[in-house]
Curated annotation (Swiss-Prot):
Organism: Cryptococcus neoformans var. neoformans serotype D (strain JEC21 / ATCC MYA-565)
Mechanisms controlling activity: Alternates between an inactive form bound to GDP and an active form bound to GTP. Activated by a guanine nucleotide-exchange factor (GEF) and inactivated by a GTPase-activating protein (GAP).
Pfam families tied to this protein: Ras
Location(s) in or outside the cell: Cell membrane
Name of the molecule in the record: Ras-like protein
InterPro entries: P-loop_NTPase, Small_GTP-bd, Small_GTPase, Small_GTPase_Ras-type
Gene name of this polypeptide: RAS1
Propeptide: 214-216
PROSITE patterns in alphabetical order: RAS
Bilayer topology: Lipid-anchor
């Protein structure tokens, strides 16, 4: 029986400071368009179905508040998340420094020494405003035993790759710690491939876009 006939659900949480582009990344991934102006997010949830590495994935994506006044909500979604995108803006040193705080909170809530995360350096289209160098993001991700991916929600650079990387990290983690959650698979015609052979390695990140997933 093909791997594509099994549907696994993954609870992804997008975390980061205010104004780093968490909602723009999420909406670009889910709906394939860029939202430039919107009210600060409190909490939005999206669902999207993909095939990643020949396995069906139902992604339940939670876009969270970055503002400090909503900090009390964080532990609640950190308890339920299976993988996290830790987002900062390359144009904001302070947002980069916040990433470690978010990561420490995740490990504390999960009571783990390691948990699946991907560090996402957003707004790479604003190179002329860069405050955080690429090697700094990579070095931080190494501390978390994670991958760092530079993205642009505006230009759709590495947006899909960032979400795919989190799913792959979750799968590796689940193989070590126990079986993943599964739900009934839909008809084959509803599925679209994401992350095929060209993206099999986690460190293969470029401007290619993987589209065509089903939004639920």
């Amino acid at each position: 029986m093909s791997k594509a006939q099994f549907l696994r659900e993954y609870k992804l949480v997008v975390v980061g400071g205010g104004g780093v582009g968490k909602s723009a990344l999420t909406i670009q991934f889910i709906q394939s368009h860029f939202v430039d102006e919107y009210d600060p997010t409190i909490e939005d949830s999206y669902r999207k179905q993909c095939i990643i590495d020949e396995e069906v994935a139902l992604l339940d994506v939670l876009d969270t508040a970055g503002q400090e006044e909503y900090g009390a909500m964080r532990e609640q979604y950190m308890r339920t998340g299976e993988g996290f995108l830790l987002v900062y803006s390359i144009t904001s040193r302070s947002s980069f420094e916040e990433v470690s705080t978010f990561h420490q909170q995740i490990l504390r809530v999960k009571d783990k020494d390691y948990f699946p995360v991907v560090v996402v350096a957003n707004k790479c289209d604003l190179e002329y405003e860069r405050q955080v160098q690429p090697h700094e993001g990579r070095d931080l991700a190494k501390r978390f035993n994670a991958q760092c991916i530079e993205t642009s929600a505006k230009q759709r650079v590495n947006v899909d790759e960032a979400f795919i990387a989190v799913v792959r990290a979750i799968r590796r983690y689940q193989k070590e710690s126990g079986p993943p959650q599964a739900v009934n698979a839909p008809a084959k015609s509803q599925m679209s491939a994401v992350g095929g052979r060209a993206a099999e390695k986690d460190d293969h990140v470029d401007k290619g876009c993987c589209r065509g997933c089903v939004v639920l």
